UniProtKB/Swiss-Prot annotation:
Entries under Pfam families matching the protein: DUF1507
HAMAP family to which the protein is assigned, alphabetical: UPF0358
InterPro entries hit by this protein: UPF0358, UPF0358_sf
Record protein name field: UPF0358 protein Aflv_1873
Similarity comment: family membership: Belongs to the UPF0358 family.
Top-level taxon of the source organism: Bacteria
Amino acid sequence: MTPEVAINFRERAYSLLQADAEKIVKLIQVQMDHLTMPQCPLYEEVLDTQMFGLSREIDFAVRLGLVDEKDGKAILDRLERELSALHEACTKKKKK
């Protein structure tokens, strides 16, 4: 495999992971807009499942050498911060 092809595979893998992460961000944003998590545990389950699936995708890409471990961790850290903000917002709403 030529270096150019290897770089293209890495870029493509990272791009796909970012796209999947963006889908999860959109789910989180919908939740933030409606703050429905306390009333809808199913939606929380969907988010957890999506996060788990993405973490497995990232792990696979890291093991293949297509994505650096630190880059994969950065994607998950960003989503964890988004989820944390969602939980905080829902908790504040629940207390009101």
